Swiss-Prot record:
Consequence of gene disruption: Grinder formation defects, whereby the grinder is formed, but it is small. Animals have a fragile cuticle phenotype, which is prone to rupturing at random positions along the body. This phenotype is intensified in response to hypotonic shock. Due to a compromised cuticle barrier, which increases permeability to exogenous chemicals, all animals become paralyzed in response to acetylcholine agonist tetramisole or the GABA agonist piperazine.
Compartments where located: Perikaryon; Cell projection, Dendrite; Golgi apparatus; Cytoplasmic vesicle
Organism: Caenorhabditis elegans
Function: The small GTPases Rab are key regulators of intracellular membrane trafficking, from the formation of transport vesicles to their fusion with membranes. Rabs cycle between an inactive GDP-bound form and an active GTP-bound form that is able to recruit to membranes different set of downstream effectors directly responsible for vesicle formation, movement, tethering and fusion. In its active GTP-bound form, acts redundantly with rab-6.1 (in its active GTP-bound form) to positively regulate the retrograde trafficking of cargo molecules from endosomes to the Golgi compartment.
Modified residues (Cysteine methyl ester): 205
Full protein name: Ras-related protein rab-6.2
GO CC annotations, alphabetized: cytoplasmic vesicle; cytosol; dendrite; endomembrane system; Golgi apparatus; Golgi cisterna; Golgi trans cisterna; perikaryon
Amino acid sequence: MSDFGNPLKKFKLVFLGEQSVGKTSLITRFMYDSFDNTYQATIGIDFLSKTMYLEDRTVRLQLWDTAGQERFRSLIPSYIRDSTVAVVVYDITNSNSFHQTSKWIDDVRTERGSDVIIMLVGNKTDLSDKRQVTTDEGERKAKELNVMFIETSAKAGYNVKQLFRRIAGALPGIIKDDPVEPPNVVTMDPIRQRQIVTDEGSCWC
């Protein structure tokens, strides 16, 4: 039986990874089904929210987009601390960003222990001719670290919906069916909130 009348369950997803791996682009593709070719580094932390309709309930996903630059690293543990899901993103054309995912995952487990869902995401599959990290390498690391794994392209939209479907299926108390969207229901319910502004006059991205 559907419990659409019950209060929304809220789950916090924090996106982590090196600068320019595509964290913001993945969120933008999921929220708005769009892609911005103009790169602008995230300043501080951005927060967005979207309602997702599952087989047996409705949930609100709170998406926290973190900056990859070193100068913002000290801010990130406080955002990891109460998260349900950590999405650790790397760029398949940048082997260093892949190697750094081990550190990001360590940071998550330092703050959350084992009480967290971790998804390792290899982004930018549209640039396969420049690939430096194979799919097998990503799968092996995910298995070694006991985390989930998927490859995506925020630019092409490849596997982005599947990424969030798999996350939704792994959420605590959620039956692991693919989420469905009831007909004639608008699911995009974005709330954007600037959490931290460190550079005066900077624009969000």
